[in-house]
Regions:
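Short, N-terminal intrinsically disordered low-complexity segments that are rich in Pro/Gly
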Residues: 1-2, 282
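Short, basic interhelical loop/turn and adjoining N-cap
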Residues: 2-15
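Non-heme di-metal
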Residues: 9-10, 18-22, 26, 242-244, ...
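Active-site-proximal, Lys/Arg-enriched surface segment
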Residues: 16-100, 108, 212-221
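Single, function-defining residue in the core of a domain
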Residues: 42-44, 58-62, 96-391
């Protein structure tokens, strides 16, 4: 027991050292570059950058930067928790599976929100950090919920020609018709048309698409300056149903080639009248980040850290994330593990750990035999067994 305690203490002391923090930072950079290498073979496909944040509850008070946080998704009787908030960016990369394009979700990293800058500014800086990894011809789309669909993050789209944004927005966001054509009369031309309402100015589809009626309209909104964008409104019922608003800086006609080889409906229905709703359907990739949070928190011990400093916590959380993503990337990087592409990350981790454990056991066993027992027959048999394990 004392040996185990010493090992745990050594692990956490190591995370506080600057040398280890620098090495961990290099590991994170290598992981990010490897993630982007996976998408170069499908460079004509769109890549998604999902932005969100998650909270980790901590009962102790000695953790650096621990504070009271509002949790809108809490179901324990209180909307507040004591803990840390992490902003995360997830990369959804296209991969071939069963002669179709499927998307693999890889969280790129976590940054702790320390309240020195807003979560919007933190997310924008993380996106600026990864954008140079994209080739100029590689299209990227930011996916985010209504908390992040604001001007701080929306303005970053204008900084890169190959970057767009699809996001849920506040239902009371101000929208206008596009500016009318110039009449030739004297005076300054109008910047926009009349103000639009989600209640009266969106014509809904005749039938439900999935669980919702959908209305589409080209609009101008202050969130994206004078840029014309596509707006969508979804409703459970045409008259009195709950409505949600979405904005997209990319238009359906720009996604025609992307949809042709998609694995799932309705993304592959390019010839139907649903094509105009494709940007809205793409928002479904945003839910992959919630699945990632659930897996990392419940199975990969993302919330179990005992490091006290902010830097140490960030390093540990990101190292756990790298281990998680390595299990996702490896079946696509090494054909030897290709059978695990359709299996869960946890199942692949178990199988891989079993193989590593058996090889370590056999190697140590052979080393001890060579030291203490001089039996050529046993040594040859065990070496042959090790070769079979490797190949």
């Amino acid at each position: 027991m004392l040996v185990l305690i010493k090992r745990v203490k050594t692990k956490y002391l190591l995370l506080e050292q600057k040398k280890f923090q620098n090495k961990s930072k290099n590991i994170c950079e290598v992981y990010q570059s490897e993630s982007f290498r996976c998408i170069m073979s499908l460079s004509y496909r769109i890549t998604f950058l999902c932005v969100d944040d998650t909270m980790v509850a901590k009962t102790g008070t000695r953790f650096e930067n621990v504070s009271k946080l509002f949790d809108h998704a809490a179901h324990n009787g209180s909307n507040y928790l004591n803990g840390h908030c992490f902003v995360n960016i997830m990369l959804c990369i296209p991969v071939w599976k069963n002669d179709r394009v499927s998307y693999l979700s890889l969280p790129l990293g976590y940054r702790m929100w320390q309240k020195k800058e807003s979560k919007l500014e933190l997310a924008a800086s993380m996106i600026r950090q990864v954008m140079p990894e994209f080739q100029e011809k590689k299209q990227a789309i930011i996916l985010c919920d209504s908390w992040y669909t604001k001007q701080n993050l929306g303005s970053i789209v204008d900084e890169y020609q190959n970057l767009d944004l699809i996001g849920n927005a506040r239902i009371d966001s101000v929208m206008y018709d596009p500016a009318p054509a110039h009449t030739g009369r004297r005076g300054r031309p109008a910047k926009h048309g009349k103000r639009l309402s989600v209640e009266t100015d969106f014509a809904f589809s005749n039938e439900k698409i999935g669980d919702y009626y959908i209305g589409a309209h080209r609009v101008i909104t202050n969130l994206f300056g004078c840029r014309e964008i596509q707006a969508y409104v979804t409703a459970t019922e045409k008259e009195h149903g709950t409505k949600r608003l979405f904005f997209s800086t990319i238009f359906p006609e720009d996604l025609q080639i992307f949809c042709a080889c998609q694995e799932k409906e309705p993304l592959n229905q390019t010839g139907s009248d649903r094509m105009k709703y494709i940007p809205l359907f793409l928002y479904s990739f945003q839910w992959n980040i919630e699945t990632s949070y659930y897996e990392q928190k419940t199975i990969w011990s993302l919330c179990s850290y005992m490091v006290r400093s902010c830097k140490g916590i960030e390093m540990l959380v990101n190292l756990i994330n790298i281990c998680y993503c390595a299990m996702k990337i490896l079946p696509y990087q090494d054909e030897q593990f290709s059978e695990y592409r359709t299996k869960s990350v946890q199942e692949f981790r178990f199988e891989l750990s079993q193989g590593i454990r058996s090889q370590i056991f056999l190697t140590n066993f052979v080393r001890n035999i060579e030291t203490h027992i001089k039996s050529n027959v046993i040594i040859k048999a065990l070496k042959q067994l090790i070769r079979q394990q490797v190949y």
